[in-house]
Amino acid sequence: MTAVFDASAFLATCSNRPGVYRMFDADAKLLYVGKAKSLKKRLASYFRKSGLAPKTAALVVRIAQVETTITANETEALLLEQTLIKEWRPPYNILLRDDKSYPFVFLSSEDEYPRLSLHRGAKKRKGRYFGPYPSAGAIRESLNLLQKAFLVRQCEDSYFRNRTRPCLQYQIKRCKGPCVGLVGPEEYAEDVRHSVMFLEGRSNALADELNTGMEQAAMRLDFEKAAELRDQVAILRRVQDQQSMEGGNGDVDIVAAIVTPGGACVHLISVRGGRVLGSKNFFPQVAIEEEVGEVLLAFLGQYYLSHQERDLPAELIVNVMHEDFPVLVAAIAEARGRQLEISYRVRGTRARWQQLAVTNAEQALGARLANRQHVAARFEALAEALDLAEPPQRLECFDISHSSGEATVASCVVFGPEGPLKSDYRRYNIEGVTAGDDYAAMHQALTRRFSRLKEGEGKMPDILLVDGGKGQLAMAQEVLQELAVAGLILLGVAKGVTRKPGLETLYLNDAAHEFTLPADSPALHLIQQIRDEAHRFAITGHRARRGKARRTSTLEDVPGVGPKRRRDLLKHFGGLQELSRASIDELAKAPGISKKLAEQIYAVLHSE
């Protein structure tokens, strides 16, 4: 355990409720994410004096900070834990090689006869997504039972479009045969509507509707239809949503604001169909004397009015009221075309949701204030190391990433005394320079950044940190001189001969002013943190750009294959690798590809 982390003091304030915890080292690097039925009991087990496994002991000695997020139950803790592990890939977590996200049910919207399917990954296709579900097995069971109940197709689009007679699913009464016109669009749409009602968590309303239909069918002496509806109701009862918050329903956002002399936090929980889909913390900049109601009013206005694409719930549950909420509701109704109800005095499940949001806001703000003091101390140490009159308020760091000159990307990350300012991060796609020329790439990125600054866009940094040593530092000086930018400090950082962390060489303003800092210096830790973040941000941008180029560049050489057809081909075959393996006949079977065009595509893909 590090000297700066007081486990006893932390555990004394830790909650006994379910949740997720995140462990960080002295450089604010995320080490481990875990979940617990009782956060206090689980975290206490890490700090026993004996009996720890070697891996756990190795983790504990590096812990400098622990953050927690309270959840309503263990299932929500599991989903949040998985999300964090996927996003950050902490070194002490077990990382699955396929790194798949939790699955969703996807309902296509572009087809006359929509399809239900299991979906993982980015939500790029047009349609509706329901979930997440805790496992693929759970979602397949639900899809299987939904198919039995409502007979909505689940086959691949390519399979569906090429059928000339019903498949086995029709024979075993799992599908109504829309592929060959055995069911009309109106009847099929009704089956889809029932499926959506179930997936939205409106099982009770759906069961009531089906029960009514069953009674009406029985009165008409249509006992076959009545039996069909009876079976559908029975299936619904078997697959009631296990993730629903008990007693909850509808679409609700729960928003709680907390203000202390050190700052403010707004915690938002999104509930759709009675299921918690996720939550997020926001930390608005506020004056010390700001009232909680004012903070909440400003947040709600910006969140729902400034971002029209955000899903608007039917109701907001808040932890404090404001006299101007009716005005806000009217403004939202006018801008979004939907009525919104704001509730404060709530009972039962809704009161528990409200308290959960308040608790998470308090926990998050407390953790942020502790971390802010940690980062601010590093800024003060940097000011002392550079002999500055006062700590800097804005640091910018640039880095370059490419693969042998391919898909070069420059990154700019920004830090302040409160930590990373991610809304100010920028990436620059580098064009028109010699492949692999990092100096030219840096020149272009800095020129673009500071040209905009000269035009009045953005803020001037106090310190410009350049990764790469003397050469890149000289390039930065050249750009600043060309643009007549003055008043900022240049700091170059170069890895030492051994390239080990802690042995970096620093250059202040010019290559002649060379110095080093002790490996345990908080100022050096801040520089390392910002440099590593710039590298991470650059390499993720580079990989995305390189991947996109490699997926499409080969097909761009084929006459008659434009962007849409390239996209359709890659989607049909599942990627460039599978496309390259396809024969001419297989290519010709793809939508919109003639035999002649298939031959041209095959020739280009196998030209080397």
Swiss-Prot record:
It is found in: Cytoplasm. Gene3D superfamilies: 5' to 3' exonuclease, C-terminal subdomain, GIY-YIG endonuclease, UVR domain, UvrC, RNAse H endonuclease domain. Keywords: Cytoplasm, DNA damage, DNA excision, DNA repair, Excision nuclease, SOS response. Residues 16-94 form the GIY-YIG domain. InterPro entries: GIY-YIG_endonuc, GIY-YIG_endonuc_sf, GIY-YIG_UvrC_Cho, Hlx-hairpin-Hlx_DNA-bd_motif, RuvA_2-like, UVR_dom, UVR_dom_sf, UvrABC_protein_C. It comes from the Bacteria. Pfam families: GIY-YIG, HHH_5, UVR, UvrC_RNaseH, UvrC_RNaseH_dom. SMART domains: GIYc (SM00465), HhH1 (SM00278). One of its GO terms (molecular function) is DNA binding. SUPFAM superfamilies: C-terminal UvrC-binding domain of UvrB, GIY-YIG endonuclease, RuvA domain 2-like. Belongs to the UvrC family. Interacts with UvrB in an incision complex. This is UvrABC system protein C. The gene is uvrC.
